Amino acid sequence: VVKLAQEMGLVKLGTVAIDGTKIKANASRHKAMSYERMQQAEGELKAQIEALLERAKSTDAAEADEPEVDIPAEIQRREDRLKAITEARQRIEQRQRDADIERGRSPDDERKPRDDEGNPKGGRYKREFGVPEPKAQDNFTDPDSRIMKRAGGGFDASYNAQTVVDEQVKIIVAAELSNNAADVGQLVPMLEAVKVNTGKAPEQALADAGYRSEDNFQALAGSGTELVVAMGREGKRCAEVDAQKTPHTAAMAAKLQTDAGKAAY
């Protein structure tokens, strides 16, 4: 559809606007479980299975008057539940390992932050490598979804839908779904998706403060697309930017003070 619109001359790719919105997943938040609760539930289910196995071995006359209990079925039900919880726990742990590696951590870092040369920077990570936070969650009906905050308040199992819209003709030129609630990691891949879909980069891209990061600005510095990204929420004063530590962010802040920057924003 995008290519057809482009062939018809409808897609201009002068200025595009990037934004994200949370879409509720087809999954109940009541079907989610925290990492801490998973660990507790695994222990409880293992104990129940062991007790049922012992009961099957030692059935006596005292149970003759009790309603018949299908012990194999009860064991199977608990084993199925245990398997589902164990798989969910392992998914959370794998996600945490992947996230830690992306942040520059390693399994043997001894919880000590290090610089690019491997030298300790001081301080200490609050948890071991790959160990999730107790409140980290996984959903049994839609494991790919994540608990995200709703715009009106509260939380749901959701996805973060990203769109890039041609500002002149209001045509969506790229759309993707992410299970990361934060927008900041989507700026580079969404602009790359525009190039994949249309064969060219937009001249200018507008985005709100959720996409602001020094890494984003640096990665897109030579992309051929002029970025105009807000420094903070409208009407709120932003902290001073250190031009020595974050030169690209400082340049963006300066651009937003110009007439051209204000007009674009």
Residue positions per predicted region:
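Anion-binding and metal-coordination hotspots
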Residues: 1-265
